[in-house]
């Protein structure tokens, strides 16, 4: 075996360990949400690939929904953050950072405090938190976004993010930008527009 081959094997082994750590973080997220009393799947008792009705009790309960693009964009943003904070580290180590951030958000988002904030400040009156399945899929959507950003030029990643934001904003009057705005600094005019008033 040559030195180069041994070095490549070491890189692959380290990458596999980082990816296992990512799965470990996801498992901790699932366990914590289970201990918080979150439902595994939709209360309806079945699993849908796509839930297309935002103002429904099925939103944030199934495999994907109109907020899945927001989590893909999280992946874009976290890739950029990892690039800034962890230069020289392998992409798999940066993915671990991204997974920790996303999992922490998914846990926080499903606490009574944040759920009540969503219900008070946004159009999400029917929001009672994510199912564990939906939350795990949100984290996986972030990982997909991270991997896309790791492969595409920055301009293409930014263009995709803008298209996703405009498309979801047009289709359901909500997206990542509006979600953050209304959670942090709610505006009555935006809330009225989102409600279709």
Swiss-Prot record:
Membrane topology: Multi-pass membrane protein
Keyword Magnesium belongs to the record: no
Protein's cellular compartments: Cell membrane
Membrane-traversing stretches: 16-36, 152-172
Keywords, sorted A to Z: Cell membrane, Membrane, Transmembrane, Transmembrane helix
InterPro entries (alphabetical): DUF2585
Domain of life, per lineage: Bacteria
GO cellular component, one term: plasma membrane
The family this protein is said to belong to: Belongs to the UPF0314 family.
Identification of the protein by name: UPF0314 protein R03235
């Amino acid at each position: 075996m040559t030195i180069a081959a041994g070095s490549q094997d070491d890189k692959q082994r380290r990458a596999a360990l980082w990816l296992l750590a990512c799965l470990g973080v996801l498992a901790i997220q699932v366990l914590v949400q289970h201990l918080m009393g979150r439902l595994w799947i939709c209360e309806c008792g079945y699993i849908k690939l796509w839930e297309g009705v935002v103002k429904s009790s099925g939103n944030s309960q199934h495999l994907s929904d109109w907020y899945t693009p927001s989590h893909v964009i999280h992946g874009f943003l976290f890739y950029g953050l990892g690039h800034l904070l962890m230069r020289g580290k392998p992409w798999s180590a940066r993915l671990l950072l991204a997974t920790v951030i996303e999992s922490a958000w998914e846990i926080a988002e499903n606490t009574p405090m944040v759920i009540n904030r969503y219900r008070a400040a946004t159009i999400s009156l029917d929001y009672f938190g994510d199912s564990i399945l939906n939350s795990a899929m949100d984290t996986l959507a972030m990982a997909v976004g991270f991997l896309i950003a790791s492969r595409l030029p920055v301009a293409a990643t930014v263009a995709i993010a803008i298209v996703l934001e405009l498309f979801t904003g047009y289709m359901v009057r909500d997206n990542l930008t509006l979600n953050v705005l209304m959670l942090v600094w709610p505006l009555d005019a935006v809330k009225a527009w989102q409600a279709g008033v």
